[in-house]
């Protein structure tokens, strides 16, 4: 089952990315290194509600 999730920057808490994930394969909260245009650098982005 695929669900929509939002990724928020770990430093400035801005919600920068929307994506989909498969809950069966990834039951935990997703964490990725992505570019934050507000911080103007690559930071850890965490899944939010």
Curated annotation (Swiss-Prot):
Q: Name one GO molecular function term.
A: structural constituent of ribosome
A single GO CC term for this protein reads: ribonucleoprotein complex
State the InterPro entries in the record.
Ribosomal_bL33, Ribosomal_bL33_CS, Ribosomal_bL33_sf, Ribosomal_zn-bd
Q: Which residues form a coiled coil?
A: none
Biological process GO annotation list? translation
List the Pfam families hit by this protein, alphabetically. Answer: Ribosomal_L33
Q: Which UniProt keywords apply?
A: Ribonucleoprotein, Ribosomal protein
Tell me its family. Answer: Belongs to the bacterial ribosomal protein bL33 family.
Q: What is this protein called?
A: Large ribosomal subunit protein bL33
The lineage is: Bacteria, Bacillati, Bacillota, Clostridia, Eubacteriales
Query: Gene name on record?
Result: rpmG
């Amino acid at each position: 089952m695929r669900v929509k999730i939002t990724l928020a920057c770990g430093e400035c808490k801005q919600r920068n990315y929307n994506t989909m994930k498969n809950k069966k394969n990834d039951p935990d909260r997703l964490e990725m290194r992505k570019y934050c245009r507000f911080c103007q650098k690559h930071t850890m982005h965490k899944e939010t509600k």
